Amino acid sequence: MSRKLIRFDWAMKKLLRHKANFGILEGFLSELLRFDVTIESILESEGNKQDEYDKYNRVDILVKSQNNELMLVEVQNDSEIDYFQRMIFGVSKLVTEYIKEGEPYGTIKKIYSVNIVYFGLGQGKDYVYEYKGEFVGLHEKDILLPTSLQKQDFKVEKVSDIFPKYYILKVNNFNDVAKDTLDEWVYFLKNSEVKDGFKAKGLDKAKEKLRYESLTAEDKKMYDRFQENRRIENSVSYTAKLEEKREIAKSLLQTSLSNAEIAKHTGLTVEQVEQLRSTNE
């Protein structure tokens, strides 16, 4: 029987940094990146230096793999209009931080930016997006490839293998039907639950290690406070959005639009629009 587990973002902040729990994050990254990932160490990341608001809005963890790759995993709960730009900033910062002065550029580490978001980032119906940067010829339409020497020296097959790789998981777009092992992970990220039949790498360890009952008394208090902060933030956000919709609806009441049309434009129910109209008359 499956049971609710603690949220993945809180686990990233408090539990997944311990070596005994590396297997959970290794499993997730292995399923997403489609090759086995072994974590060598957890490095200092921006998410360790957050203000009070960010403690429950955003968390990240920076991983160094045994192949000397950097993997930045970030969870973002609330909407940010410039989130794409922040993804670029985060990766650019890593590029400059992890190359020593005077070192050749060829020593720059491969970087993976994995972004788990719980809001409507951009426009798209999918729930897992992968950025594939290629140099395409404007005239010949061919893809620029590395030379044989570059392939040998840098152990790459494509030029894009050198550049940072971006992934975005729009968790709320997932329909809860797990068709493969990556879907099983997305289901867990969305529902904090591992179903009994799930076989994805790392989820067996998540099911064992991320039980609320396994937390210390102090950690239980911290997690309960985290959950309460999230509920308050969600309530404030919902109220603000509802008020914004009402203001838009009020302005549309001055037009010839019907209640049904105003409801369609604002996301309010017809009953809510009718109530606004009767209040304004």
Predicted features and spans:
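Conserved single-residue anchors adjacent to enzymatic active/cofactor-binding motifs
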Residues: 1-218
